[in-house]
From Swiss-Prot:
One of its GO terms (biological process) is protein secretion by the type III secretion system. Its main location: secreted. GO terms for cellular component: extracellular region; host cell cytosol; host cell membrane; host cell plasma membrane; membrane. Effector proteins function to alter host cell physiology and promote bacterial survival in host tissues. Contributes to replication in macrophages. Plays a role, cooperatively with SopB, in membrane fission and macropinosome formation during invasion. Disruption phenotype: Deletion of this gene impairs bacterial replication in mouse macrophages but not in human epithelial cells. This is Secreted effector protein SopD.
Length: 317
């Protein structure tokens, strides 16, 4: 169905699903291309459609990346998520709810939909810039929402600050993890009663060797109090504390993601290690949670634990 957008001097400009699909492309020529009959009609319009499409494309995709960097990037699918959300925000209020993102039955594609029509797709492995044989753990609805929110912020940063792709990838990550909305969303899901700036609690070693060995599986096989709990969430419900681990794809996006094509094998290796921790935790969750609760209660109801004033047991660094 046609969707009404509002931007610039072109109030209430109506586009169909096909045109919206074209506008998701960063390729300006493809996005604003008009067929022969469309061009004839445009000749008689007071408000030229070709100009409106150019303006709209610039609003969504910026002015391009400028000079290409030394390394090729794989950002089409993650930027498409941002472009789709940008279109949704430009739609009139009555039409914004028509824009939805769903996962397909195979859990490998995000379907970008307007009404009941799929206008485009984003492959989750291309979004993450990982190899085709990499494993993606299934996500809950809440995890998918957070995942897409992070994708939107990454896409926004790369669209409007293309210079970030010329700098160290850590600069891009800091822009994302430092985003106030992302911090709020991550903590609301993982540690709703704890603020991102919650002060650390000094480590009190009360664990046996066996307990430390059991906890090693949630930290790449190591036990180190200052980093052990950086992926662990917790919240109290009716006096009981429940623990969880951040989904590996979310951890990866926040702390390991690189858009450079040549980094695909490295990216896949990072995700594989995160998957291993995630699966090991859930395989031994009954036993691990008992130890976590013991530490939680003896450290002021927090796992933001440190030693000598130093800690990385926060969700976002």
């Amino acid at each position: 169905m046609p969707v009404t957008l509002s931007f610039g001097n072109h109030q209430n400009y109506t586009l169909n699903e096909s045109r919206l699909a074209h506008l998701l492309s960063a390729d300006k020529e493809k996005a604003i291309h008009m067929g022969g009959w469309d061009k004839v009609q445009d000749h008689f319009r007071a408000e030229k459609k070709d100009h409106a499409l150019e303006v709209l494309h610039s609003i969504i995709h910026g002015q391009g990346r400028g000079e290409p960097g030394e390394m090729e990037v794989n950002v089409e699918d993650i930027n498409k998520i941002y472009a789709f959300k940008r279109l949704q925000h430009l739609a009139c209020p009555a039409h914004q709810d028509l824009f939805t993102i769903k996962m397909d039955a195979s859990q490998t594609q995000f379907l970008l939909m307007v009404g009941d029509t799929v206008i485009s797709q984003s492959n989750i492995k291309d979004i993450l810039n990982i190899s085709d044989d990499a494993v993606i753990e299934s996500m809950s609805r809440e995890e998918r929402q957070l995942f897409l929110q992070i994708c939107e912020v990454i896409g926004s940063k790369m669209t409007w600050h293309p210079e970030l792709l010329q700098e160290s990838i850590s600069t891009l990550r800091k822009e994302v993890t430092g985003n106030a909305q992302i911090k709020t969303a991550v903590y609301e899901m993982m540690r709703p009663a704890e603020a991102p700036d919650h002060p650390l609690v000094e480590w009190q070693d009360s664990l046996t060797a066996d307990e430390k060995s059991m906890l090693a599986c949630i930290n790449a096989g190591n036990f180190e109090p200052t980093t052990q709990f950086c992926k662990i969430g917790y919240q109290e419900v009716q006096g009981e504390v429940a623990f969880s681990m951040m989904h590996p794809c979310i951890s990866y996006l926040l702390h390991s993601y690189s858009p450079f094509s040549e980094f695909k094998p490295t990216n896949s290796g990072f995700l594989k290690k995160l998957n291993q921790d995630y699966n090991d935790y859930h395989a031994k969750k009954m036993f691990i949670d008992v130890i976590l609760e013991k530490l939680y209660l003896t450290h002021e109801r927090s796992l933001h634990i440190g030693k000598d004033g130093c800690s990385r047991n926060i969700l976002l660094t």
